Amino acid sequence: MTDDATSDDIAEQKAVRLQKRARLIEDAETAGEGAYPVSLPITSSIAAVRAQFPDLEADATTGLVVGLAGRVVHSRNTGKLCFAALQAGDGSRIQAMVSLDQVGESSLERWKELVDLGDFVFVSGEVISSRRGELSILVAEWKIASKALMPLPNLHADLSDETRVRQRYLDLITREQARATVRARATTVASLRATFASHDFLEVETPMLQTIHGGASARPFVTHSNAFDTELFLRIAPELFLKRAVVGGLERVFEINRNFRNEGADSTHSPEFAMLEAYQSYGDYHSIADLTQELVQNAAQAVSGSHVVTWADGTEFDLGGEWARLPMYASLSEAAGVEVTPQSTVPELEKLAASVGVEVKLSTHGKLVEELWEHFVKPGLTAPTFVMDFPVDTSPLVRDHRSIAGVVEKWDLYVRGFELATGYSELVDPVIQRERFVEQAKQGARGDDEAMRLDEEFLRAMEHGMPPMGGMGMGIDRLLMAITGLGIRETILFPLVK
């Protein structure tokens, strides 16, 4: 099957395969067996056999008999000998040789009549090398483990982007890069956990369904609990519950889990995404930035063997060294050619925004500064950079800067020009936190869908005493983007599509 195969072609092939399935079932019932075996006498894997015999000479025998299974991805039948390439889930392949001498006429004809591309097949036989030097299994016994009713795509032709996303299983079957991305993601998450463990962090889990959405500025997904007869939200962030854990004495915690935001989807955004958040008692935004750099660099090392990663298009990107720390206001002033400070008024900022075509809904000082910074400065960022010291009115959970009035101790980490992570010196004063929540509620009343709600339960926890801490959040999908150079839909195994 090619990516553009017609529905009539597919229907015809499926009809033929259904007939073969019917025969399999009939033959199995006659023999008193199941057509789809529950288990198989597998003794090895394709990868293990290839590793054991990497340089077997042509036309050689080994005397080793193995039983293994794989998906048929190539097949060629001749009079007395049939060849099939079996592929394992890791992409490794081995040739199966089904010969008249070894299996007999009836079994050989049955192979020719029943086995199709895409079928899972078990074979047992001696490991040999063919006359052309191809590592092979000289089959003595075989069995169809599972019948494919749909034909495989052409392994030598690219799937369309749409097919790759909607039918990721076909992408995994046909493309090594897809399989490598899944492995890279697993390696990355394992590396993150190992780095946290080396710093005595404890992994915890917090609620996905919440009665009040908070911890980030974003629109939530809303649902309803029949059992409790109440409105619930899919979480936009785990922050407020993780901080409760810190109040309870869990001084270093992290969570890797799903977040949901009812917003746009593009090359760097997905409504459902994997998020890492961590909180470190007695730290600040400097110490948590150091930890974030270590997390990213360790993950790059685990995946690529180096801090210099190679992207899917062959580009090399250096995640090593010490990353720059760039003040937001100073960098904006330099790029815009106009001094912008925490004391700049909204009309002044609106005038600057209008002069360059930047539109901001519900203008506030912080929203204008951040949008202007994205217009003037963000396009020039490529190397990993911590953008430091944000406006106070867009960061309600962050403590005031220790020496600069009107800003908070917050950074955003940019890699390849997109935001990878964010970090704070966390606000721990419950009185100021209540004032910030009240201001957020006012913004919500003015139509800001992303404003946080006042969370009395969280404030009650804070009132029991919250230690000073640094906190950070990082998208796992975006971390894979930084390491692999792929878009976000490629880093998510099964992304949401229309």
Model-identified regions with their sequence ranges:
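Class II aminoacyl-tRNA synthetase catalytic cores and aaRS-like
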Residues: 1-498
